[in-house]
């Protein structure tokens, strides 16, 4: 999910964007424009379809301010990577440590409630969702094969 950033104490905003991604496509739902349709609620509650993300507790709390639902089969990558002994739980660091590639988080603090999302926001939101799937699949494979080694560097980063 993406929410308009807060810059003043006591201010809060509702979730503006929900990303739903597969391996090849990502759909961006502008919840601030369309509300939460019943098909999205059904997806959120579906226990057969895994929903993968990072720090999902925060997302669940924010989504519940918009609509009440019973979460079904959510997989939080933060819990998964802790099984590997990885301590830095940010998406950017996880992706860099596992894939040795960098992803930009520059658009994270942009206005997700704007009339139109610009191409950079769209790319950021889609990448954010797709990255979680990619990490999940890779970590699942590594867990099954045991083909990884945790390496600590001088910076205390953990690399798989």
Question: What function would you assign to each model-found segment?
Answer:
Residues 3-141:
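Conserved DEDDh/DEDDy metal-dependent 3′-5′ exonuclease domain
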Residues 133-160:
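Acidic two-metal-ion nuclease catalytic site recognized across multiple nuclease folds
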């Amino acid at each position: 999910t993406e929410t308009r950033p807060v810059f003043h104490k006591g201010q809060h905003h509702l979730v503006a964007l929900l990303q739903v991604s597969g391996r090849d496509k990502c759909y961006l739902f502008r919840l601030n424009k369309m509300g939460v349709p019943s098909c999205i609620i059904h997806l959120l509650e579906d226990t057969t379809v895994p929903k993968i993300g990072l720090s999902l507790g925060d997302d669940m709390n924010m989504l519940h301010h918009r609509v009440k639902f019973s979460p079904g089969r959510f997989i939080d990558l933060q819990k998964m990577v802790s099984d590997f002994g990885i301590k830095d739980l940010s998406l950017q660091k996880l992706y860099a440590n596992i894939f040795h590639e960098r992803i930009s988080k520059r658009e994270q603090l942009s206005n997700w409630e704007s009339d139109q999302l610009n191409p950079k926001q769209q790319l950021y939101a889609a990448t954010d969702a797709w990255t979680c799937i990619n990490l999940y699949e890779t970590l699942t494979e590594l867990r099954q094969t045991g083909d990884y080694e945790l390496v600590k560097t001088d910076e205390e980063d953990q690399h798989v």
